[in-house]
Structure formats: structure tokens, C-alpha cells
From Swiss-Prot:
Main location: cytoplasm
Claim: Kinase is one of the keywords in the record: no
Subunit structure: Homotetramer, a dimer of dimers. One homotetramer interacts with 1 SecA dimer.
Gene giving rise to this polypeptide: secB
HAMAP family: SecB (MF_00821)
Annotated function: One of the proteins required for the normal export of preproteins out of the cell cytoplasm. It is a molecular chaperone that binds to a subset of precursor proteins, maintaining them in a translocation-competent state. It also specifically binds to its receptor SecA.
Organism in which the protein naturally occurs: Shewanella amazonensis (strain ATCC BAA-1098 / SB2B)
Name of the protein in question: Protein-export protein SecB
Family in the record: Belongs to the SecB family.
Amino acid sequence: MAEVANNEQQAPQFNIQRIYTKDVSFETPNSPAVFQKEWNPEVKLDLDTRSTKLADDIFEVVLSVTVTAKNGDETAFLCEVQQAGIFHIGGLTEPQLAHSLGAYCPNILFPYARESVASMVSRGTFPQLNLAPVNFDALFAQYVQQRAAAAQPTEEANA
């Protein structure tokens, strides 16, 4: 019986407890002049994630999405969304947990953030903006490689 209980405790667990918008901002610093010009924007997307342990096996993950649209030299709009979620994640190894917090959870949050961005841009009366899907698994793998490369010279110096 104790063996069964140990197996149950070690079984991977993943549950979404809540998904919510933590912060939003939409700015049109050069309005109304921006509406009088030919629309040929350059759109820049910045992403960031962070996670916080709230309790045993309970984590908040925040995906920050910043979209900046420039029309020529002027900023047409700046849209910022912090989409968050509270997740129950247990029974994972440290690398599995890091991947869940850095890639899997942001994959869940991104469609909500994308919808918020599209809605704010539309309400700002700009042409529709649909953000392309993001491969958070690839971004996380790149982050892990960069950390490993940054740690390598330190290890060589200590040898």
C-alpha cells in the first residue's frame, strides 16, 4: 500500500487553476497625426516569461507581450499585455519543471495574450493585427543553450 501511495505522489501532475490578465496597456503617442499618414508599419514583438513559486507545486507564470508598431520614424502604437496563469505542477524532475514553466505554460497563455493584443489594436482603430504562433519550446531550448554557454567559461576559469 505504501508503494502505491509513493507512486501516486510521484506521478506527474499538471492542472490549470486560473488564467487571467494581470496588466494591459495601449498607447498611441502620435495620435491623431498617425491616422493621417499612409499606413506602412514596422511591427516589433518582444516576449518575456517569468515564474514565481506560490506554494508547494503551485506556480504563477506571467507571459509579457509587447508589440510596438512604427510608421516611419514615429511610434504608431505600443501595446503591452501581461497574461498570467496559476498552475499546479508536481511530480516532475527539475529539468521537466523548468521546461513546463518556461515553455509549456507560456504556450497555454499565448492565445489569450494574442487575443488581447488583437482586441486593443482593433479598438485603437488600427488595421487588424494577428500575431503568429510562437514556438516557446524552441525559445526555451535556445535559452538553455545560452545559459550553458555562459556558464562554460566560468567553469573553465575555475579549473
